Amino acid sequence: MGIPVNSENVNDETEGDVAGKEVYYLCGNSLGLMPKDTKETVTRELDAWRDRAVESHFKHPTDTSWVDIDLPVVPLLAPIVGGKNEEVAVMNTLTANLNSLLVSFYRPTKKRFKIVFEKKAFPSDYYAFYNQCRLHNFDPNECILQISARPNETFLRTEDILKVIEENNESIALVCLPGIQYYSGQLFEIERITKFAHQYPEIIVGWDLAHAVGNVPLKLHDWGVDFACWCSYKYLNSGPGSIGGLFIHEKWHHSALKFGDDVNHDEYRPRLAGWWGNNNEKRFQMLEKFEPIKGALGFRQSNPSVLDVVCLQSSLKIFQKYGGVENLRLKSLKLTKYLINQLQKSPYYHPKKQSSKEELGFRIITPIQNESQYGAQISIQLTPSRLTGKNKDTMEIVFEYMHRHGVVVDERKPNVIRISPVPLYNTFQDVFTTVAILNSALDSVKKSIKALKSN
């Protein structure tokens, strides 16, 4: 699917006239496209604000009152993550939710304090884990246990993850990995890793599902995941910086329903509490007694952004209409397999065993041996890292060429381009054109190299 480009947004250095033509957008892993109904949905809430102002909290002129605005979203979102309604909440943003969950679920002791996650994790996750160690007066160098890929490999092997857990089971407090790794595009074996770690009852297992939610089928409840969190602006298409979500397994819902003088504090799971997690029947009584709603809703803190919530709801209705993630995954696999096929046909594709750091081209760093190892995203690594006589990396030159020629993908330093065909709006033609322009970009680089050598 192409998206029109406004002429004022086209760089002056554009080769050829792209203005007014279509762009091939394979960047849903970074920001999903806006659903057609979203503008009308947002306008309806703006009208309610204009016409009713504060009264829309309880007497919305056309739709759900704002005091309950997030509640209709939960039944749409729960099937996407494979949770029960009471295990899911719409709230905050991804890192805010991760920090909130760590407050509740990271309970270190002198002997059991380590946090396990992958090397080269998304930086925001690293910062959250690092600061949890510091908050509990642990040395991050001893508290953080990162798992690296084997030498000359680009993704983690499940057996290596399990080995680290087994060897450190007496000192691990938390395992928290990404459902899909943001850089490599690797889809982790969530069920297998979770069940293995839970052989050791005191280990908590959480997942950052930023790149997995809305991308691949999830069954968090059945898999026994303790907690998970995600954003919604990638494959869930809710808009830039939009509201996130979290999952808390029902096995943790036994916490006391009251927190005050009359409660056994040992039954209460501490959290970053706020009035939106309180008993909604007493929320506006302004009592100095916290009675958290049972389940994930009890972890909410503040009233959510109405505009964010309705943007998410607009997109989730599309997922429901087309049979959910399981159904969309069938098309997604076809698109991504076609992408892999086209990349492997490229004259610049260098399989791992034949690749050279000095040879112009790319290799696929996403595990592609089995469809259970990847989602929509395929990551390619460009070589060589820098061209002689050029001030830019090879990846930057190729990325900019593709953008000038109407392909929107994204790049990650130092040398990776991520390509993600999304089943809700991408086509096989999008994929074909994207790889064709990638090849043209590398042709252009090759000509530049020859010109430099001849001078």
Swiss-Prot record:
Enzyme class: hydrolase
Gene Ontology molecular function terms on file: kynureninase activity; pyridoxal phosphate binding
The keyword Hydrolase belongs to this UniProt entry's keyword annotation: yes
SUPFAM superfamilies registered for this protein in UniProt: PLP-dependent transferases
Needed cofactors: pyridoxal 5'-phosphate
Cell location: Cytoplasm
Pathway(s) served: Amino-acid degradation; L-kynurenine degradation; L-alanine and anthranilate from L-kynurenine: step 1/1; Cofactor biosynthesis; NAD(+) biosynthesis; quinolinate from L-kynurenine: step 2/3
Modified residues (N6-(pyridoxal phosphate)lysine): K234
InterPro entries per UniProt: Kynureninase, PyrdxlP-dep_Trfase, PyrdxlP-dep_Trfase_major, PyrdxlP-dep_Trfase_small
Residues the entry annotates as binding pyridoxal 5'-phosphate: L94, T95, F122, P123, S124, D125, D208, H211, Y233, W275, N303
Keywords associated with the record: Cytoplasm, Hydrolase, Pyridine nucleotide biosynthesis, Pyridoxal phosphate
Pfam families: KYNU_C
Similarity comment: Belongs to the kynureninase family.
Role: Catalyzes the cleavage of L-kynurenine (L-Kyn) and L-3-hydroxykynurenine (L-3OHKyn) into anthranilic acid (AA) and 3-hydroxyanthranilic acid (3-OHAA), respectively.
Name of the protein this chain belongs to: Kynureninase
Source species taxonomy: Eukaryota, Fungi, Dikarya, Ascomycota, Saccharomycotina
Recorded name of the encoding gene: BNA5
